[in-house]
């Protein structure tokens, strides 16, 4: 982080000007982020695709931090979120010669959704939360995190819960519906109600749809991304699937 601090003193940010047009894929656990990312595999020669670094969280020199966090959040929430911050920052600043980078989640959702939820439910003591906030402030001031468009895979907690049950990841076996409901509200506050700072536009997709019917939503977002790149402009502020418009209006 010394290089980042040096850049900050010079009035520039570390990694500034090094990243292409960057799209962040956001949504609850079980919202279909990895499936969405797989949709762009056909463009892998032109796009830098970065999945959420879950495998790193599962193996920190032989330690499964993700599993430990779910089993004993009071003890492991702080080290887990510290490592999440590091690994997400590595993805944000990873060099690429591609014209487009698409990332599964970001340092923003870690801060505004997961860390905030841990503070609210008591998994993070106030001192722990304050420490993480200081890290986020340092990153915000010193390191450039490219974000041109957020794709929000908007999913009801009940649908997300059923998908989690079906995929049966061992670490997620203890995830209750209430936890997904809490995360859903935090995503809504951030991406729909805009109660958190936003540096880019948001495209909202109806991710409750099953695989047979969600292709239209994928195609809509794909067109929006490539149109924005070709015109060097960002899409309209909040583009919402027709089936979701009434919910956003409330």
UniProtKB/Swiss-Prot annotation:
Signal peptide from the UniProt entry: none
The Gene Ontology CC terms held by the record are: cytoplasm; mitochondrion
Catalyses:
a 2'-deoxyribonucleoside + ATP = a 2'-deoxyribonucleoside 5'-phosphate + ADP + H(+)
Provide the activity regulation entry from the record.
Subject to feedback inhibition by dTTP.
Q: What InterPro entries does the annotation carry?
A: DCK/DGK, Deoxyribonucleoside_kinase, DNK_dom, P-loop_NTPase
* Protein residues bound to ATP: 27-35
Which controlled-vocabulary keywords does the entry list?
ATP-binding, DNA synthesis, Kinase, Nucleotide-binding, Phosphoprotein, Transferase
Q: Which GO terms describe its molecular function?
A: ATP binding; cytidine kinase activity; deoxyadenosine kinase activity; deoxycytidine kinase activity; deoxyguanosine kinase activity; deoxynucleoside kinase activity; kinase activity; thymidine kinase activity
Residues engaged in binding substrate:
52, 70, 81, 105, 172
Q: What is its EC number?
A: 2.7.1.145
Sites bearing Phosphoserine, chain numbering: 236, 241, 243
Active site located where?
A: 104
Any one GO biological process? DNA biosynthetic process
Mind telling me which residue stretches traverse the membrane in this protein?
none
Matching Pfam families: dNK
On subunit structure and binding partners, the annotation says: Monomer.
Please explain the role this protein plays, according to its UniProt record. Answer: Deoxyribonucleoside kinase that has a broad specificity phosphorylating thymidine, 2'-deoxyriboadenosine, 2'-deoxyribocytidine and 2'-deoxyriboguanosine. Specificity is higher for pyrimidine nucleosides. Several anti-viral and anti-cancer nucleoside analogs are also efficiently phosphorylated.
- Family per UniProt? Belongs to the DCK/DGK family.
Name used for this protein in its record: Deoxynucleoside kinase
- Gene source species: Drosophila melanogaster
Q: What is the lineage of its organism?
A: Eukaryota, Metazoa, Ecdysozoa, Arthropoda, Hexapoda
């Amino acid at each position: 982080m010394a290089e980042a601090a040096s850049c900050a003193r010079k009035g520039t940010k570390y990694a500034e000007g090094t990243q292409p047009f960057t799209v962040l894929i956001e949504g609850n656990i079980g919202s279909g982020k990895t499936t969405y990312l797989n949709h762009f595999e056909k463009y892998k020669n032109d796009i830098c695709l970065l999945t959420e670094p879950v495998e790193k969280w599962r193996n920190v020199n032989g330690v499964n931090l993700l599993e430990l966090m779910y089993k004993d959040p009071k003890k492991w929430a702080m080290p887990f979120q510290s490592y999440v911050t590091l690994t997400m920052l590595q993805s944000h600043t990873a060099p690429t010669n591609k014209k487009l980078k698409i990332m599964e989640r970001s340092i923003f959702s870690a801060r505004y959704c997961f860390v905030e939820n841990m503070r609210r439910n008591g998994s993070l003591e106030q001192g722990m939360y304050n420490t993480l906030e200081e890290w986020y402030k340092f990153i915000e001031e010193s390191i450039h995190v490219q974000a041109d468009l957020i794709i929000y895979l908007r999913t009801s907690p009940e649908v997300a819960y059923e998908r989690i049950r079906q995929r049966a990841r061992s670490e997620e076996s203890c995830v209750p519906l209430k936890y997904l409901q809490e995360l859903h509200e935090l995503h809504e506050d951030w991406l729909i109600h805009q109660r958190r700072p936003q540096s880019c536009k948001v495209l909202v997709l109806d991710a409750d749809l099953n695989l047979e019917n969600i292709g239209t939503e994928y195609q809509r977002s794909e067109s929006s991304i490539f149109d924005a790149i070709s015109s060097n402009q960002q899409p309209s502020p909040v583009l919402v699937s027709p089936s979701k418009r009434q919910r956003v209006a409330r």
